[in-house]
Amino acid sequence: MATPSMLPQWSYMHIAGQDAAEYLSPALVQFAQATSSYFKLDNKFRNPTVAPTHDVTTERSQRLQLRFVPVMQEDGQYTYKTRFQLAVGDNRVLDMASTYFDIRGTLDRGPSFKPYSGTAYNALAPRAGANNCLFNGSGANINTLAQVPFAGAITVNGQAAVTDNTYQPEPQLGPESWVDGTLADLGDASGRALKASTPRMPCYGSYAPPTNENGGQATGAVERRFYKVTTNNNNEADALLYTEDVNLQTPDTHLVHQVSDDQVTGVQGLGQQAAPNRPNYIGFRDNFIGLMYYNSNGNLGVLAGQSSQLNAVVDLQDRNTELSYQLLLDALTDRSRYFSMWNQAVDSYDQDVRIIDNHGVEDDMPNYCFPLSGMGPLTNMTAMKVNNQNFQTDNTNVGPIQKIGFGNVEAMEINLNANLFKGFLYSNVALYLPDAYKYTPDNIVAPANANTYAYMNVRLPAANLIDTFVNIGARWSPDVMDSVNPFNHHRNAGLRYRSQLLGNGRYCSFHIQVPQKFFAIKNLLLLPGTYTYEWSFRKDVNMILQSSLGNDLRVDGASINIQSINLYASFFPMAHNTASTLEAMLRNDVNDQSFADYLSAANMLYPIPANTTNLPISIPARNWAGFRGWSFTRIKQRETPALGSPYDPYFTYSGSIPYLDSTFYLSHTFRRVSIMFDSSVSWPGNDRLLTPNEFEIKRYVDGEGYNVAQSNMTKDWFLVQMLAHYNIGYQGYHLPESYKDRMYSFLRNFEPMCRQLVDVTNYATYQSVTVGHQHNNSGYASALSTFNPREGHPYPANWPYPLIGVNAVPTVTQKKFLCDRTLWRIPFSSNFMSMGTLTDLGQNLLYSNSAHALDMTFEVDAMNEPTLLYVLFEVFDVARVHQPHRGVIEVVYLRTPFSAGNATT
């Protein structure tokens, strides 16, 4: 193959958008058109076709798929390495786009896996309601708290209906009418109860495994305890408890109100309150992100012809294989449609959780609940009759039941709508608050490792931070939640789907199909010859699995075992002469296959220390021809693994990885960015609203009215984003075409917000009441946390200040925006090298054929944890594949202007 220096000079052009993917010679295009009647050569997701009925190469050519068994497998501690030998026979062409790795194995998702909200056990029980039980009193005394519903006469031998006390009387049986025990005498009754030696736990969430096929749960002898009503003068038993010890467990709940150890077995232990464990879906990442190991340190994949042994795969640490694949799919198809074969279910979040549209609750009509009898309270009465001018007792044909209720029917009121909204806010927002806004309840010991599921479960959010009255009437995201990853949430529908594909149990077997994503070979037409194909697969559960809570799955007991990896591939169903013609054409270097990486960008990560607001970066001098611009965002350091290692010991996190899956959510933290070349040229000139060399993203104080769309984004930045994403701007604003306005686009994710706050400077009587002293719903809610037992008494609320009505306080307007998923973009092109003052007289040229250094300064909002500036330098990234002879494959990677491995060299 000719060396790059012998090839014709590449001509650079400005490519609008990222749609240019493959460049084919005119001859190859003509060939594709000639064969398009039965096969679409240029379509990656190829349509199914029927193979020719005659004149085919061999019977294998007509098979839909072939299985390749590995010739070498190496199951290491951190990776599973596998090697295949691809034999492509004469007059056949292997379609690399059809290949996938077929992987089987077993998965232990660990004890932190909980694929549902709430509890599966006694979910209807009150949170602090007790089981039927005996409990300790003073000294050796035993106390009793129980319900006895099973009616039947009691003798010294127990109840006659109870023939096997290992499971009878069963706790789910009792009278079926409200009449029994109210109007009609229930008589003697029995039930089951836990012995005092069984630990105290609330009924909500409690479970004991059966010990016999009839459902009995006793782990030892069942003992009878007899009781009589204290007011009865006879010496007969009225109630009977069959007491037993059971193996009491709480599979999916924990205590949020716990008494001290010396009170657990006493009466105070009956009032402990349970809460469900937090839901935690665990599944493979979208499109199996992180499973295949892309690396440049010797563990990278190999595709080499056995004749030449030249590896066609040259991966770089600054290449964006996973992110590029995500954005490519978004350009091709609707990402909101899930597809199980490739585990394709994009990470998402509930819009109502990220931005709370708090329009109050529609509780104009009160909600009542009534007693089962439908009347009451009932009073025992005596029948009377008239005797002359007086009354006397009527004993004629009068039965023993004479009950009458005075006044209206007894009822209790509950505000269902307010409770539902309050519960929604607690489960979906408050529980996901940063840890600094949570506390550990008394008598509960939290684990030292904050990345564990057990730690996340016991921490409770403080009251009044997220509630129905906070920002009421506004569409606003809680400020403290803006920098919390919204994709690490149980309402991430894509993750929930991927978790459910594996089933609902902790232990599961999996059988998955993993596509090849590397841009240089995922569309390759492999010509006849014998090739070595090798790849490594990670076994680090934090990298290959994703969880809702982002807990450290290594510590929490998850593990994976890969049992086998096979490769499936397809040959083109072509006749002899067609296949040989295609091969002959592709052997010619003028018909080399050229593939452009979809993202075509070199990425760099620059650390931003905690509480830092300015970050300068420098790029050494280079020729900027072919450069297309910058894309950038911000990601958290703890959510970003070291990709060069198969196992990053510092990556103690399993939530979404924005660096790989495009779940960006910190774009709103940028304030401005300046771009300076080492020349006198002001780039991009003063034809914009603001200062040359500087892009102002948002303004907190906007005296000149530069902000746009009821937010604090500047008009200039809005214009730049509309231009960069849609080429909309100078010709007036309009909505972009649907094929451009996809999941990751700017306009779809731009969310302006506005609210009013008390003007503390102009409201003389304003009192800054701290959260702990604010009360609203006192007596009906907890002062500590929503989940704690209610406390207090009814009283006028002291928070928040009214922003409406005749007593509305003075206010100021606050504005902001969010723009998740989207990469900020600044376009650049060799065509725009002369963007000085855009006049015929004053243009200064930033010559494209000379080298210039670049200095950029980013101003960002301070965050209290280390973050990373993620910059994509949009380059011209093309692989040109040449297969001159049988079993020989050569690839030239062209990467301008960053031809070396990363953007700093």
Curated annotation (Swiss-Prot):
SUPFAM superfamilies cross-referenced by the UniProt entry: Group II dsDNA viruses VP
Reported function: Major capsid protein that self-associates to form 240 hexon trimers, each in the shape of a hexagon, building most of the pseudo T=25 capsid. Assembled into trimeric units with the help of the chaperone shutoff protein. Transported by pre-protein VI to the nucleus where it associates with other structural proteins to form an empty capsid. Might be involved, through its interaction with host dyneins, in the intracellular microtubule-dependent transport of incoming viral capsid to the nucleus.
Keyword Ubl conjugation: no
Assigned keywords, A-Z: Acetylation, Capsid protein, Cytoplasmic inwards viral transport, Host nucleus, Host-virus interaction, Late protein, Microtubular inwards viral transport, Phosphoprotein, T=25 icosahedral capsid protein, Virion, Virus entry into host cell
Gene name of the encoded protein: L3
GO molecular function: structural molecule activity
Pfam families linked to this entry: Adeno_hexon, Adeno_hexon_C
Protein name: Hexon protein
Induction description: Expressed in the late phase of the viral replicative cycle.
